Swiss-Prot record:
It comes from Nitratidesulfovibrio vulgaris (strain DP4) (Desulfovibrio vulgaris). The gene is rlmN. This is Dual-specificity RNA methyltransferase RlmN. [4Fe-4S] cluster binds at C116, C120, C123. S-adenosyl-L-methionine binds at G169, E170, S201, S223, L224, H225, N299. It holds the Pfam family Radical_SAM.
Length: 364
């Protein structure tokens, strides 16, 4: 059976004509039902004939991720633990904000892999190891779940406004499925997200970086987190295989649209990378590119190897960057009371499962 959410529009058109003998326009109808109207069954597609719906049901399925757990923070952040068809667990987070007019807007943080191979020492997902890549249908299934949860059914006035590939996994290590997802997101008859409302975040992987830039399908964010190669090797051991200086050199010629800048994500770890000496090194790096900085205050979970920086060090770090004409914004951590940082909810769920299994095990 073909999972129809894994098909690009061109693939769906070929499937409808070759497998079902339908005219090409039928693919457009099905496509709009899948992505604009969030249909979970072929029976919902009321402008498609019953005979065609029956043939679709014989040869294809529509597989959404199943919602395993939902947690809502006091600040409105909502985190989902989703179960995929093979039982794998991934996370997605909805982060609320308000427009200047006070209208609710939601940013969704998307996962693209089950687990992660990068092994970043500050990240809960990194401690889980890598299981597999997610398919396009699984990646975009997170968006469908979010829209259904929000009752977001008006493409002309969407509640879900922005998407960030900053969840579980490294996007450039699942480049093919991420690029397929971006094309479907950009499709005006599909999910219809402007590239300016999508950001792909990478640890700094050489392979695929240029292809992403030349596609023009999304903005780029780089999870920098280290002002020099020594710290990069310590806290981001896999990413450090591509030397920090080489990464910045590649970003100097990264294709950018008018008024577009690379966003550097910098996680402030207490006593590790949050000193003025680190800020000086960071200025030298970022000033080589057309970029801006998002400063993220570390949100430690129980048993984590790092501490949050002090408010004094955070302020001094930010002020130094501004004094050197580097745009730096402190990004407030949301959802701290529901383990909203990447991988924390899944890690908690796995620990609970292990504890339950141990409690139920027969005694020797």
């Amino acid at each position: 059976m073909t999972d129809i959410l894994n098909l690009t529009y061109e693939e769906l058109e070929a499937f409808m004509t070759a497998e079902l003998g339908e005219p090409r326009f039928r693919a457009r109808q099905v496509w709009q039902w899948l992505w604009q109207k969030c249909a979970r069954s072929f029976d919902e597609m009321t402008n498609v004939s019953k005979a065609t719906r029956a043939r679709l049901a014989e040869k294809a399925v529509i597989t959404w991720p199943e919602v395993e757990t939902v947690q809502k923070s006091a600040d409105g952040t909502t985190k989902f633990l989703l179960r995929l068809a093979d039982g794998a667990l991934v996370e997605t987070v909805l982060i609320p904000s308000a427009s200047r007019e006070g209208t609710l807007r939601i940013t969704q943080c998307l996962s693209c892999q089950v687990g992660c191979a990068m092994g970043c020492t500050f990240c809960s997902t990194g401690t889980m190891g890598f299981e597999r890549n997610m398919t396009m249908g699984e990646i975009l299934g997170q968006v469908l779940v979010a829209r259904a949860h929000l009752g977001d059914s008006r493409p002309d006035h969407p509640i879900l406004r922005n998407l960030v590939f900053m969840g579980m996994g490294e996007p450039l290590l699942n480049l093919n499925e991420v690029m397929r997802s971006l094309r479907t997101l950009n499709d005006e008859f599909g999910l219809s997200f402007s590239p300016r409302r999508i950001t792909v975040s990478t640890c700094g992987i050489e392979k695929g970086l240029r292809e992403l830039g030349e596609s023009g399908l999304a903005f780029l964010a780089v999870s920098l987190h280290a002002p020099n190669q020594e710290i990069r090797k310590r806290i981001m051991p896999k990413a450090a295989h591509w030397h920090l200086d080489d990464l910045i050199t590649a970003l100097e010629s990264y294709p950018l649209k008018t008024r577009e800048r690379v966003t550097f994500e910098y996680l402030l770890l207490g006593g590790v990378n949050d000193g003025i000496e680190h800020a000086r090194e960071l200025v030298r790096l970022v000033s080589r590119t057309k970029g801006k900085l998002n400063l993220i205050v570390y949100n430690p979970a129980e048993g984590d190897p790092y501490d949050a920086p002090t408010p004094e060090r955070i302020l001094a770090f930010e002020q130094y960057l501004w004094s050197k004409n580097i745009t730096a914004i402190i990004r407030k951590s949301k959802g701290q009371d529901i383990k909203a940082a990447c991988g924390q909810l899944k890690a908690s769920e796995l620990q609970r499962g292990t504890a339950s299994a141990g409690a139920d095990a027969p005694e020797d």
